[in-house]
């Protein structure tokens, strides 16, 4: 009797031991699983990653060969991202560096104690590959400019080509209007250097009254280069020879050293003229040299 009972107990134990354990938690199907916190977090992460990919504009990447939108006064082919902006200050001191002896130059702190021609420029990316700018100097000249990329340098084409149009006027854009048209052609040598050739035409460059003017247009070919010396240090050079039309004085020429730090760029330059608009550059330079600087800031 005891053996029968023992066998019965063992049989029941084996029977219940082999039964599957039922979970009290409900089984989620695929739709329910997507609603769990872990799955929701994954979905949010994927959405953020997708948004980051969509916002990845190559125009926002640092261009080590062309870190700024100008050389000294001439424009470059650097693209400004859509709906982004940049700001630039130009400063040209009025004391000639060759005036007096060296001790006089030091006393005047290399021209920093003298008056200066100052300019402010705001640049905006209106569309992809299209930027607009307004530049005002402290002699109340205002220049408006629009620049459009036609072709970008790539493996199949060695040049970048931009076209631009400008209009400037004196007395806060009330008098002496000077429209201009030009082309910017550049070539980058890897990330070490960039060279430029910029033919452009400017009207109403002769400041004399119209009845005394035989030639009131200037055609120039701006030539420039930027060489990266170290990770963030550059040497810059440009010259703007007039090849036809009104061409008084000397061709405007500038050279300098430039330091880039993040979105900022500081350039110390030497030039034989004060001009920072196309009409001013068309009027040429002097036989003297002047110290100046540019400060620029990108807002992206």
Regions found by a protein language model. Give the residues of each.
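Bacterial N-terminal signal peptides that target proteins for export
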Residues: 1-10
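Transmembrane beta-barrel domains of Gram-negative outer membranes and organellar outer membranes
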Residues: 25-172, 176-181, 186-193, 200-206, ...
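Short amphipathic alpha-helical segments
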Residues: 220, 232, 236, 250-252, ...
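A mid-sequence, solvent-exposed acidic-amphipathic segment
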Residues: 197-241
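A compositional/structural signature marking long, glycine- and acidic/polar-rich segments
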Residues: 7, 228-239, 249, 287-289
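Bacterial N-terminal signal peptides
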Residues: 9-20
């Amino acid at each position: 009797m005891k053996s029968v009972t023992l066998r019965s107990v063992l049989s029941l134990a084996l029977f219940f031991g082999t039964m599957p354990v039922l979970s009290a938690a409900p089984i989620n199907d695929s739709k329910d699983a997507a609603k769990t916190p872990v799955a929701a977090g994954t979905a949010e992460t994927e959405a953020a990653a997708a948004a980051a990919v969509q916002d990845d504009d190559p125009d926002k990447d640092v261009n080590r060969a062309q870190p700024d939108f100008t050389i000294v006064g001439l424009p470059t082919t650097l693209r400004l991202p859509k709906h982004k902006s940049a700001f630039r200050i130009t400063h040209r001191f009025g004391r000639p560096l060759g005036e007096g002896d060296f001790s006089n130059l030091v006393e005047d702190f290399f021209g920093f104690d003298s008056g200066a021609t100052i300019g402010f420029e705001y640049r905006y990316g209106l569309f992809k590959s299209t930027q607009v700018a307004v530049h005002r100097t402290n002699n109340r000249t205002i220049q408006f400019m629009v620049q459009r990329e036609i072709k970008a340098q790539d493996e199949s084409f060695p040049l970048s080509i931009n076209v631009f149009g400008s209009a400037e006027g004196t007395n806060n854009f009330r008098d002496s209007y000077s429209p201009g048209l030009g082309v910017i052609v550049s070539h980058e040598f890897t990330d070490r250097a960039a060279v430029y050739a910029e033919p452009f035409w400017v009207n109403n460059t002769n400041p004399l009254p119209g009845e005394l003017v035989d030639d009131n247009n200037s055609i120039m070919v701006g030539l420039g280069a930027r060489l990266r010396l170290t990770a963030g240090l550059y040497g810059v050079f440009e010259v703007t020879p007039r090849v036809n039309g009104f061409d008084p004085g000397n061709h405007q020429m500038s050279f300098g050293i430039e330091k880039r730090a993040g979105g900022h760029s500081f350039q110390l330059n030497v030039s034989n003229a004060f001009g920072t608009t196309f009409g001013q550059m068309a009027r040429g330079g002097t036989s003297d040299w002047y110290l100046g600087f540019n400060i620029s800031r990108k807002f992206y």
